[in-house]
Amino acid sequence: VNKIIFKKNDLIYSILLMPFLSKKNQINLLKKSYKSLKSGGGFICINKIQSSNSQFQDIFNQLYFDFKKSKKISSNDILKKAQSLRSVMTLNTQAEEIKNLKKVGFKKIEVFFKYLNFIGIIAVK
């Protein structure tokens, strides 16, 4: 993250990247993104998140498992992937995602998509 150089931009998007960064690097990337946006520029991110409620988390996980099964992915393959990702992903809650955007300076923030454990957020500088 520290090696990434941004030019001035009207729009930056991050698709399923943040969960693969440490909390510190998530904030660093958000800071760099915010600083490189022109006034009125937008930041769009789509991330996998952790539910703030364990019961909902279990329901969402099961529904996502069922979705993958409907796509003819074997139970074994689904479990292997889930296990391999568990050790490399740092998931935030929806509230943490919004708090991080506010922390780096964004004031206009809106959730535009939410499905199970996935969220889309747009923030404007």
Located regions from the model:
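Active-site micro-motifs of SAM-dependent methyltransferase domains
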Residues: 2-3, 18-19, 50
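Conserved beta-strand signature within the Rossmann-like core of class I S-adenosyl-L-methionine
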Residues: 40-48
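A short glycine-rich, Lys/Arg-flanked "PGG" loop and its adjoining helix->strand segment in the class I
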Residues: 27-39
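Core SAM-dependent methyltransferase catalytic element
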Residues: 98-125
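A short SAM/SAH-binding and catalytic strip from SAM-dependent methyltransferases
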Residues: 10-25
